[in-house]
Amino acid sequence: MCLSCQFWCLECQESGVGCRCVDCCSCLQCAAGCQGAPKRSQPEAGVASAAVTIQPSGALNNAPREPSAPPLSQTLSPRQVLARYQM
């Protein structure tokens, strides 16, 4: 799953590994998915239009989330992110 936009590819769903596609994810499916998924930093109008054109809005709402994970922590290194999800 990309921690920036909450996109999950099939490989990441099976492994449960968190990543941030823009800077540390080696999974090409995740990187490709994140390029087309709405980013949280976009204005609301951009997010709404992207959600309509790329995938159903229900799919975004039903994405699996880690309840204990912090929401978009920019200070974690890739190793810290992996360590958190390997506990």
Swiss-Prot record:
Subcellular location: Host endoplasmic reticulum membrane; Host cytoplasm, Host cytoskeleton; Virion; Host cell membrane
Keyword Lyase: no
Protein family: Belongs to the hepevirus ORF3 protein family.
Entry's free-text remark on domains: The PSAP motif is necessary for the release of membrane-wrapped virions from infected cells.
Membrane topology: Lipid-anchor
Presence of the UniProt keyword Membrane in the record: yes
Function: Small multifunctional phosphoprotein involved in virion morphogenesis, egress and counteracting host innate immunity.
Record note on modification: Palmitoylated in the N-terminus.
Keywords from the named record: Host cell membrane, Host cytoplasm, Host cytoskeleton, Host endoplasmic reticulum, Host membrane, Lipoprotein, Membrane, Virion
GO cellular component terms, A-Z: host cell endoplasmic reticulum membrane; host cell plasma membrane; host cytoskeleton; membrane; virion component
Region entry Disordered, spans: 58-87
Upper classification of the organism: Viruses, Riboviria, Orthornavirae, Kitrinoviricota, Alsuviricetes
Record's protein name: Protein ORF3
Motif (PTAP/PSAP motif): 67-70
Organism: Avian hepatitis E virus (isolate Chicken/California/Meng) (AHEV)
Extra facts: The viral particles present in feces and bile are non-enveloped, while those in circulating blood and culture supernatants are covered with a cellular membrane (quasi-enveloped).
